[in-house]
Swiss-Prot record:
It comes from Arabidopsis thaliana. This is Glutamate receptor 1.3. GO terms for molecular function: calcium channel activity; glutamate receptor activity; ligand-gated monoatomic ion channel activity. The chain crosses the membrane at residues 558-578, 588-608, 620-640, 790-810. One of its GO terms (cellular component) is plasma membrane.
Amino acid sequence: MERFCIQTQTLLSFLLVLLLFISRSFASTKNDDVDGGKRVQIRVGLVLDLGSLKGKIVKNSVSMALSYFYAIHNDYKTRVSVSLRNSHGEPLLALASAVDLLKTEGVEAIIGGNSLLEAKLLGELGEKARVPMISLDSPFSLSLSKYTHLIQATHDSTSEAKGITSFINVFDWNSVALVYEDHDDWRESMQLLVEHFHENGVRVQSKVGFTVSSSEDFVMGRLQQLKDLGTTVFVVHLSEVIATHLFPCARRLGLMGDGFVWILTAKTMNSFHENIDDFTKQAMEGVVGFKSYIPMSIELQNFTLRWRKSLPVEEAELTRLSISGIWAHDIAFALARAAEVIRMPNVTSTLLEEITKTRFNGLSGDFQLNDKKLLSNKFEIINMIGSSERRVGFLNSNGSFSNRRHLSSTHNKLETIIWPGGSAQSPKGTSLIDSDRKKLRVLVTSSNRFPRLMKVETDPVTNELIVEGFCIEVFRASISPFNYEVEYIPWLNGSNYDNLAYALHSQKDKYDAAVGDITITSNRSTYVDFTLPFTEMGLGIVAVKERSMWVFFQPLTPDLWITSAFFFVLTGVIVWLIERAENKEFQGSWPQQIGVVLWFGFSTLVYAHREKLKHNLSRFVVTVWVFAVLILTASYTATLTSMMTVQQIRFNSNEDYVGHLSGSLIANVALTSSSLRAMRSLGLNSAADYAQALLNKTVSFVVDELPYLKVVLGENPTHFFMVKTQSTTNGFGFMFQKGFELVPNVSREISKLRTSEKLNEMEKRWFDNQLPYTTDDTSNPITLYRFRGLFIIIGVSFAFALAVLVILCLRDKWEILVDNLDLSQRLRHFRIHFVRSIHTSPLDDPIGETAVQMAQQNRQ
């Protein structure tokens, strides 16, 4: 019985515990359902190239990050859900996918934009839709800063450029060769590095670009060129795919041995993964690289462990978590935190604003956005040893180096670096053939049409090629600071320099550069690299100097001469009318009065009028006219002075011929301009032809580039003058093969020659040109139209004076005119009064006397 009771109690206790567990489970399930009903879904788009290793890593990283985040924050009311789209590595498809996510899924943010073009397209879309666009590891570009809704997660290219430059300066290397990937992303991100090199005295000796499709033979050929130039320090800025071909080729050419330095940028190092084969790793022995620093932490170790456990067998290649994956993890955390904040009561900020304010300790370290950029400015310096990476130091924020992460030092102390070839001794970084003169194969133009510019001939005795002229002197002065032995090769295929540019481009094994009267054009620049121009830019016109004995008539046009003469006479007439009644100097016989009128009017030209004016009205007329004369004489003097020093060219499209250099594309372009299109042209072949055609008037003037015309002026300084026109050409430059290391150096030397006046001295020596022979066609005759306002003022003033004079006359005789006289008598009386005002004494004028007598008889 007792045993039964015990069993009954045990059963009841078990049932009670079971009932309590069921009730708790039910309550928990009910609460979960309630909570689940309150959770808000925040949709985020993910646009990736799922066919790439990077795309797969980012996808898994974001998914795992969100799962882990909500596992440790189960009480959050929001849930970020991801909508995935595959861009297949196509920027336009990525844009289309982003638009689809916005329309169909209503996403509130999009993660993508792994290339520069994708980032720009998504940035534009973000501006239109006002939705945050998050770009992972897109290259640094100032062009992206204008997008206010674009967030970038990448390394700080400015800090990296300073670090690499400081690293090169620490070892006292003064020149490097840039080996880069010829793609927009890599070219754009390389520009900042090149700028820092120039600012800090690191000379870029050469640039060599490769693409993913570059063959092994092409890679070997370009590396061989670098080796021939004696390059020992290489800065590599390209993707992992190209690196797997580059370093084995470099090793076969002996460029991975003692004395060589290979430096990898952070973008290159960050793209490396564990799937590089052992052969490539062995070839990279001794390479030094900059890599974005990810601090080791418990969280990173745990995430890496979960990462590896979650990978399916078919994705075994994703074993190693990349830096992009770590940044994607932290971005997902930031999105989840920001999504929770914006759903809180009394919060009015947007998702973009909350993301930019979010700060936490993530897998990449201290996560904080600065100006919408997650800029990782912490770098570790890696030394490739065998198949492993060995950290030899850190790049500090001040640009110095240390062998410990938290040690701020200005002494640039690093761990021992094992360089290519296995040596621990720092390479000198000097050219392998600095002690030997390098040979430069130069094509020289040999048409000899303008010997002062370029003259090529063979010595009949020694059979030696003799090269002279202004162009070759500038070239020799520009290349003299560099240790080159120059071999001149005449270009015998005429004056078509487009073909010369193509020959230089296509026959790289034969020629390195070209020198001569070669104009810089956009078409030629597609095949070769040009230096800075060493001549004046633009076209000019040369004509025979005019020696006219009537040059003093040219400042004013005929209509202005006639109008001015008319107003001189009119001034004298009006003053005579006003002064004649009271001023004896304006009285006398008709010939005397006509002489006074003409004398007074024209004497105002030189302010020589001596007649004393008694009437204020005449003084007003003279004052206005003297003001006008002052303007006319000043303008005439200035224009005449200009015309005496500046010659002018008159175009007559119906009669004139214009000369130009035969076969010159530049001259042909000039002849199609609006002012010269209708004129007839004549091709000439040399400076002597130019002079002869101008002197015998076969052509009225010659149009060509300024250097050619300066030769003509130098040979005939007393016969011709030149008018410089618009700078429609780019001047002469030296041509080099694309990417040739001497181009920036020679351009720098040309700039020095110009600023030091040495280039000007060379021009004077070869062209004998002086400033009076070069003028601007700016002195045009003054037209009546330009002075129409002045003459309107004068005309109105004169009309006003005449009106006042008439009113005064009428006022004095008004009673007589209106007193019992009909209209005909009034007019007759007014005529008599006017005659008397001209001839005050009737005895002096019988006509006037008769008129007075007739008037008196009529009144009686």
